[in-house]
Amino acid sequence: MKRSHYFIAVPLTSEAKQAISRFSGDASSSLPFRTWVHEEDYHITLAFLGDVPPGKMAPLCEAMAAVAAKSAPFSLALAGLGTFGERTAPRIFWQGVKEEAALNELRRDVYEACLSLGFSLDRRPFAPHITIARKWQGEAPFQPEALRSLPAASTVFSVPEIVLYRTNMEKTPKYETIAAFPLLGAPDGRTGEGMGQLLKLRDYISRYETDVYHYVPEFIRLKQWQWEQAKARWEAERDADGARREPGETWDFLLDKPSWWERLIGRWRRGPEPEMDEERSPAPSLSRAATLDELKWQFLDDLFELQGMPAGRL
């Protein structure tokens, strides 16, 4: 059975991808590399994991969510070109980024978290780059000096999240988003910013789609963990601000969350329920996929409730 490879990376914005793609299109006519990377596959690798057994998926996602929760969003600037491999026959042609302390710190935290989970990682020093082409196949040796005359892409882009990708070698583009983790830290070093950060989770929750469904119990536990972390941050900030919590506030309904999650896991494990007429069973029967959709929308509805807004599905 063919195993999938996974990695944690910084994604690029559409604008940054387009800038590199335009450069790539121009450069490919004069630089005979065998493969030019698809625009949607541009990224900055933080940790290459290789295979991720099902039992490690939930701990990995929890660890990445924790790292992201304490990291503040930042910006990067495209700058410079370079190669890896032999000087005259490089195996990688890359676009660089300007030195950024926030990126180095994020990579350090991601790397250490992955090591603590037992992943075997590349020990070489971190060299942030975006691979744009592979394998020199020119008849003449590659001339590094030629890069100086190329009009490299130049733009600044935001980094609001880190992503767990899976490699699909038989597809184009070949890197598939498995989970995205929003950077929720505040610039002053605090973890989270109360409701504003909670609402960010609403914007990202729809990212947890297709392939995470293969690890449904782990996925459900991850959602429970994220909810508990967000709730704890919000309550801590409420307490720090000296706000008085009235009985019956919106947090009260969260006390039943553990039993709700357990019921949902149980329903998923039982599989599709038999069809019944409306008189015998007013509640709709749910397939496993429908139950997972319920999970996603329930999480969204909970966030809407915390805002004091009617529940709604975006």
Swiss-Prot record:
The chemistry this enzyme catalyses reads: a 3'-end 2',3'-cyclophospho-ribonucleotide-RNA + H2O = a 3'-end 2'-phospho-ribonucleotide-RNA + H(+)
User: Which SUPFAM superfamilies does the protein's record reference?
Assistant: LigT-like
Task: Motif HXTX 2 — list its residue ranges.
Answer: 129-132
Q: What keywords does the record list, in alphabetical order?
A: Hydrolase
Question: Where is the motif named HXTX 1 mapped on this chain?
Answer: 43-46
Q: Which organism is it from?
A: Geobacillus stearothermophilus
Q: Quote the protein name from its UniProt record.
A: RNA 2',3'-cyclic phosphodiesterase
What's the Enzyme Commission number for this chain? Answer: 3.1.4.58
Its taxonomic placement starts with: Bacteria, Bacillati, Bacillota, Bacilli, Bacillales
Q: What class of enzyme is it?
A: hydrolase
Q: Which GO terms describe its molecular function?
A: 2',3'-cyclic-nucleotide 3'-phosphodiesterase activity; RNA 2',3'-cyclic 3'-phosphodiesterase activity
Q: Which family does it belong to?
A: Belongs to the 2H phosphoesterase superfamily. ThpR family.
Q: What are the positions of the active site?
A: 43, 129
Q: What does this protein do?
A: Hydrolyzes RNA 2',3'-cyclic phosphodiester to an RNA 2'-phosphomonoester.
Annotated InterPro entries: Cyclic_Pdiesterase (IPR009097), Phosphoesterase_HXTX (IPR014051), RNA_CPDase (IPR004175)
Q: Which domain of life is it from?
A: Bacteria
